[in-house]
Amino acid sequence: FYFLNTIDILTEPDNHALICYGDSITAQSWPDWLALRAWNEHRRHVAVIRRAVCGTRILRQYDCITYQAYGLRGATRFPIEMNVSGATDVIIQHGINDIIHPVGTDVNPFRPWSDMPTAEELERGVQDIYVEHARRLGLRVWSGTLLPIEGWRTYNADRDKLRCEFNTWLRESPLFDGCVDFDRALRDPDHPSQFAPGYDSGDHLHPSEEAYKAMAACVPGHLL
C-alpha cells in the first residue's frame, strides 16, 4: 500500500526490526519472502521493514519532472528512512541504477555520461552516506551485492566490470558487519554476468519470483 508508510506498535523489549534498503529490486518481494521465512522458522521477535524506492541512486537524483518518480538520492533518503523504531540491522542493496542509468545527452538529455560513477565514488558514497549514518544510529550494517545485468538494455562490458568491482568491495570491506551475497545466490555459475536459469524476470535486471525467494533464503539466519 503506497499510502501507508509505517505502523509502530508497543511490544516486548526483545523484539527488533531488520531494515531492507534499496531500489526497485527491494521494492518487490524478497523482503516479503524474508518476513515469511522468519515466521515459518518461528522467529517471531523480528519485523522485516522495507525501505525501497524504484529508480533511486546512491549519488545523484534527477532534477527534471520527468524522472521525479525515481526519488531522492541516498544522502537525502537514508537519514529519513532509517527512522525505524527498534531497528538493529540494515541490509543495503543499492547502486545498480547509478551504473545503468547514464546513456549520454545525445540519447537522453537528463542522463549525461558525467553521471557515471567510478567504483571508488560508489564505495565512498556507501561509506559516507550509509555506513557512517547507520553507525551513529547504532545499527549493524550488511552489504548486499548487486545482481547480474547482462541483457539489460543499457548493458555493456564496462558497466558490468564496474558492478563486479563494486561487488568485490561489498564482499570484502571491513566497514560492514557482513555481506549478503545476492549476486552469488542468483547468478549463473557458468555465465556469472547473467541470472541463473529461472531467476530472470525477463528484463535481465529484475529477478523472477523464484529468485526473490532465493534472495530471502540467503540472508543469514542470525539477522532474524
Predicted regions and their residues:
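Extracellular glycan-modifying ectodomains
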Residues: 12-14, 44, 71-88, 96-102, ...
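Structural recognition of the beta-strand scaffold that forms the well-ordered cores
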Residues: 17-22, 26, 46-52, 88-94, ...
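Extracytoplasmic/secreted proteins, especially bacterial periplasmic and envelope-associated proteins
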Residues: 29, 33, 73, 77, ...
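Extracellular protease catalytic domains of secreted zymogens
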Residues: 102-113, 117-126, 144-161
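N-terminal secretory targeting modules
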Residues: 1-21, 26-27, 40-44, 224
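Oxyanion-hole/transition-state-stabilizing segment in secreted/luminal serine hydrolases
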Residues: 58-120
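Catalytic His-Asp segment of secreted/periplasmic serine-dependent ester chemistry enzymes
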Residues: 100, 146-224
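Phosphate-binding active sites in nucleotide-utilizing proteins
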Residues: 29-76, 80-81
